[in-house]
Amino acid sequence: MGMRMMFTVFLLVVLATTVVSFPSERASDGRDDTAKDEGSDMDKLVEKKECCNPACGRHYSCGR
């Protein structure tokens, strides 16, 4: 195989991997329900003005 063909195969593999790992908007099969629950928990803490997560901790107290 030539270098150009190997590079083309590499790009196709990268593209296929990206498309497969890209999250879809279809109905969930339950694999990411925990992640959704954790996000809602963080929203509840932000409503209380308490957040120990570094993403929101600089704006709110930790509450510990």
Swiss-Prot record:
Keywords: Acetylcholine receptor inhibiting toxin, Amidation, Cleavage on pair of basic residues, Disulfide bond, Ion channel impairing toxin, Neurotoxin, Postsynaptic neurotoxin, Secreted, Signal, Toxin. The modification Cysteine amide is found at residue 62. GO terms for molecular function: acetylcholine receptor inhibitor activity; ion channel regulator activity; toxin activity. One of its GO terms (cellular component) is host cell postsynaptic membrane. Belongs to the conotoxin A superfamily. Changing residue 59 to A: No significant change in inhibitory potency towards mouse muscle-type acetylcholine receptor. Disulfide bonds join 51-56, 52-62. This is Alpha-conotoxin GI. Not hydroxylated; hydroxylation, on a synthetic hydroxylated GI, improves its folding but impairs its activity against target receptors. Its main location: secreted. Changing residue 54 to A: 10-fold decrease in inhibitory potency towards mouse muscle-type acetylcholine receptor. 2-fold increase in inhibitory potency towards rat alpha-9-alpha-10/CHRNA9-CHRNA10 nAChRs. It comes from Conus geographus (Geography cone). The record marks 60 as: Key residue that binds to three hydrophobic amino acids of the delta subunit of muscle-type acetylcholine receptor. Residues 1-21 form the signal peptide. Residues 22-49 form a propeptide.
